[in-house]
């Protein structure tokens, strides 16, 4: 591919000394794999190293490379994992002897997953100290192309809103300096070619496997080239490296799609489910939980939790989670963080007793923790005020009346870890929600933010190792630390503190660009919603929450019997489709920021099942019909919509779509479940072969069998298969050809039975006495004769509702007769009888 590189004398673009007098060779104009400061490349850099004299320069030259089986791993950091035969590692070593530094570029290639990972190890090979001032994990240079930058901005309770910006000359930069990946920007970016849509166009993704400060820079330079960088934020970062020490830059996951944004998202979803999350629960059905927070906040007792468990069990909920307020003197958010001892007075007994009482109700038990925090009004702070992060000589910045414990220090982590383990060892705790409700402010050293995050990872690694059966859910005021680093330890993260169903459609939409549905904590909450005051129906809240891990945040005792029954039905529905929702291929069908609906769907791997969810976001008088086009189906397959019983071809569903019912109220929601009629495809192949062997201009095929054999479903699907291949096919129901309308025919059957018994009834059913075989035989004969117009009979439900209609049969070469009596000896003109023994 070196032919794409061009060389010219670029004014004011310097030339490396090694290039001699060649003024056409400039690092300022050529793509770089890992650009550094001080080389004559004036674009944004990946690496900046300062030596003991304060010189900032690193001229990295190729030293060696190695390709090996398996995927590299990173000590103390989360990273993509793979079996030995699923990945390869490329390691490129760059060196600057003058700066006395080696840079190891690590590439993990997961070919079947369409994923490449990148990380960097920086080694001080000298005798003195060096300082890393900036370190990106990956750099991508493009010599041409017009791109849009897709980033995901937000705030507390409204995270990961998609913003698409054309990349003009200069730099688009975003990131976090809050100590976490943050609510404000997610550590992820997409570079999409102009015009790229959900289903077409080229796009490149980068996802940082890290939960702390990060920086992303997209730059279009003077020569219309593009550079994309993602890595550690250089602000508040200055990492000293002593002689012989090595620093590891966290990993970036890269992927590319030539088929639009949906395909890119699906590649990331598969990677996270199968190569990032390690929890045993990632591919398991997870418990539907109810959390005590919105039901009680801090105002609860042990009896309150048990009562909640009783209600939960009666509703089919699997687990009760006791949220904030069970420890120390924690009756509000001003005290006791750091004192992880059970408040037995508040609970009315020991935690072990409470766990037993909850389990006796037939539900599991979960608990809330916030290990990284401390209140000044706590025994821990009074004993160790120096354990809170603060700048010496300066009062700390408070947030939510709490301070941040210095998890970069092992003794701090060990103390809190021992406290948490003492709690978890008191009984069978099935679930833990790990929260973090403030950002880092008092950064006292350049290494703090990085070492802090590694301390959190160390704590979580120890927790997961000690309690492998524990379901861990991450949280940081909702989605303030929703990143791939956290998903390495917890298979799900509370998506947002905002549980409003309408806001959630947008939050979950933005989240889905990189993260799978199985990672998104989503619950049905009470109305008016506690964050927005909005009122939406129970059904709408349920449909939205089913695009996540599904659970409840409300007080069951305040619900009506009708609402409680809705919960039972919602749980049944969710559990029926849970595997499809969490493991299926996810498709975005609308943009809830611009469209009048939010719509999404999940399709099974075999493309034989699909669940479509739609929420109306606006309502207006005399509203036009809204159509939803589906994606990811087999074009030639026939699908049965479970609720209506209607059948559609995959092509029709994807190109024409399905019309939504007229709305009756604001914020309505709908779900449509589709199942492929597989037997029709198998039957079609056999019938098609028969037709090809027995070449006739017109063929009559009779599908017959007893009640419940699936004649109607199969015949409708078979007709669609013929139409799909361009064969004109008409479906005729034999139910229009009894002598009498159904009501009168039932009366006649009863009369015959009363007068002649069972033998007489058998002599009536399906014979010429009941059926007008002469009339239907005339239809079949006219069809075989090639007539273009044939008179068909229509039988209604009431007296006098018997009519005839001239029907156009021009272009029809296959007549499908669907009828219980389609195998009768009195029926003439059938070319291929097909008997159905049982329901498909």
Question: For the regions a protein language model found, what residue spans apply to each?
Answer:
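Short Pro-Gly-centered flexible turn/kink motifs
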Residues: 58-62, 239-258, 670-674
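Active-site neighborhood of glycoside hydrolase catalytic domains
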Residues: 346-350, 382-539, 549-554, 558
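Polysaccharide-binding surfaces and accessory modules of carbohydrate-active proteins
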Residues: 1-219, 235, 638-644
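Conserved nucleotide-sensing/catalytic segment adjacent to the nucleotide-binding pocket
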Residues: 730, 739-796
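Carbohydrate-binding surface patches
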Residues: 198, 591-634
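ATP-dependent NMP and nucleoside kinases share a basic, alpha-helical "lid"
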Residues: 801-839
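C-terminal beta-sandwich/jelly-roll accessory domains of carbohydrate-active enzymes
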Residues: 618-678
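Aromatic-lined carbohydrate-binding/catalytic grooves of carbohydrate-active enzymes
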Residues: 281-421, 431
């Amino acid at each position: 591919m070196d032919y794409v590189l061009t060389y010219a004398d670029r004014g004011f673009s310097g030339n490396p000394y090694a290039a001699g007098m060649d003024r056409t060779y400039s690092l300022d104009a050529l793509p770089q794999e890992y650009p550094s400061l001080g080389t004559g490349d004036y674009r944004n850099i990946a690496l900046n190293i300062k030596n003991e004299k304060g010189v900032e320069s690193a001229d990295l030259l190729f030293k060696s490379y190695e390709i090996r089986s398996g995927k590299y791993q990173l000590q103390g950091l989360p990273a993509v994992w793979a079996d030995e035969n699923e990945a390869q590692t490329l390691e490129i070593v760059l060196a600057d002897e003058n700066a006395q530094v080696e840079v190891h570029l690590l590439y993990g290639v997961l070919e079947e997953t369409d994923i490449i990972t990148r990380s960097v190890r920086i080694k001080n090979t000298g005798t003195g100290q060096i300082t890393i001032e900036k370190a990106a994990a990956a750099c991508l240079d493009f010599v041409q192309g017009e791109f849009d930058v897709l980033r995901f901005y937000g705030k507390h309770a409204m995270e990961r809103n998609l913003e698409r910006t054309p990349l003009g000359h200069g730099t688009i930069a975003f990131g976090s300096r809050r100590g976490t990946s943050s609510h404000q920007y997610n550590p992820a970016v997409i570079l999409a070619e102009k015009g790229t849509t959900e289903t077409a166009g080229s796009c490149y993704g980068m996802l940082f496997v890290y939960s702390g400060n990060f920086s992303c820079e997209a730059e279009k330079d003077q020569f219309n080239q593009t550079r994309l960088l993602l890595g550690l934020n250089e602000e508040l970062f200055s990492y000293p490296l002593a002689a012989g020490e090595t620093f590891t830059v966290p990993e970036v996951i890269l992927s590319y799609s030539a088929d639009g944004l949906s395909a890119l998202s699906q590649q990331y979803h598969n990677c996270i489910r199968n190569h990032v999350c390690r929890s045993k629960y990632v591919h398991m059905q997870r418990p539907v939980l109810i959390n005590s927070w919105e039901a009680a906040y801090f105002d609860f007792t042990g009896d309150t939790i048990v009562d909640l468990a009783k209600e939960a069990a009666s509703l089919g909920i699997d687990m009760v989670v006791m949220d904030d307020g069970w420890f120390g003197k924690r009756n509000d958010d001003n005290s006791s963080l750091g004192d992880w001892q059970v408040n037995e007075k508040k609970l009315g007994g020991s935690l072990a007793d409470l766990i037993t009482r909850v389990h006796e109700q037939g539900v599991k038990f979960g608990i809330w923790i916030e290990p990284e925090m401390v209140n000044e009004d706590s025994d821990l702070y009074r004993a160790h005020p120096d354990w809170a992060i603060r700048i010496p000589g300066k009062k700390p910045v408070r947030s939510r009346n709490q301070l941040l414990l210095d998890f970069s220090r092992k003794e701090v982590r060990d103390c809190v870890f021992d406290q948490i383990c003492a709690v978890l060892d008191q009984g069978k705790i099935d679930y833990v929600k790990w929260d973090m409700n403030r950002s880092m402010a008092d950064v006292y050293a350049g290494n703090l933010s990085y070492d802090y995050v590694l301390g959190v990872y160390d704590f979580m690694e120890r927790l997961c190792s000690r309690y492998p059966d524990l379901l861990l859910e991450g949280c940081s005021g909702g989605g303030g630390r929703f990143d791939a680093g956290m998903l390495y330890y917890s298979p799900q993260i509370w998506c947002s503190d905002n549980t409003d169903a309408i806001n959630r459609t947008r939050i979950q939409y933005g989240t889905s660009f990189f993260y799978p549905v199985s990672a998104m904590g989503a619950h049905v909450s009470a109305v008016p919603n506690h964050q927005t005051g909005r009122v939406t129906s129970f059904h709408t809240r349920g449909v939205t929450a089913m695009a996540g891990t599904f659970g409840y945040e409300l007080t069951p005792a305040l619900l009506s019997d009708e609402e409680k029954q809705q919960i039972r039905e919602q749980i049944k529905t969710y559990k029926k489709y849970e595997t499809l929702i969490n493991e299926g291929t996810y498709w975005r069908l609308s943009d809830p920021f611009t469209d009048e609906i939010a719509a999404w769907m999940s399709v099974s791997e075999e493309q034989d099942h699909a669940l479509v969810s739609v929420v109306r976001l606006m309502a207006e008088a005399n509203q036009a019909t809204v159509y939803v086009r589906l994606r990811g189906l087999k074009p030639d397959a026939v699908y049965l919509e479970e609720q209506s019983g209607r059948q559609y071809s995959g092509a029709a569903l994807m190109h024409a779509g399905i019309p939504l019912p007229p709305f009756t109220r604001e914020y309505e929601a709908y779900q449509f479940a589709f199942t492929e009629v597989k037997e029709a495809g198998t039957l079609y192949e056999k019938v098609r072969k028969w037709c090809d062997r027995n070449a006739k201009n017109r063929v009559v095929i009779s599908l017959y069998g007893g009640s419940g054999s699936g004649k109607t479903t199969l015949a409708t699907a078979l007709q669609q298969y013929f139409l799909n291949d361009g064969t004109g096919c008409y479906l005729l129901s034999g139910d229009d050809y009894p002598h009498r309308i159904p009501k009168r025919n039932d009366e006649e059957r009863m009369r015959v039975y009363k007068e002649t018994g069972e033998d007489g009834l058998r002599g009536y059913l399906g014979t010429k006495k009941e059926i007008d075989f002469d009339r239907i035989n005339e239809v079949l004969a006219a069809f075989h004769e090639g007539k273009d117009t044939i008179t068909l009979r229509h039988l209604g439900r009431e007296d006098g509702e018997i009519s005839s209609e001239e029907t156009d049969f021009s272009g029809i070469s296959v007549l499908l007769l669907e009828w219980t009596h389609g195998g009768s000896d009195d029926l003439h003109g059938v070319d291929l009888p097909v008997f159905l023994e049982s329901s498909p």
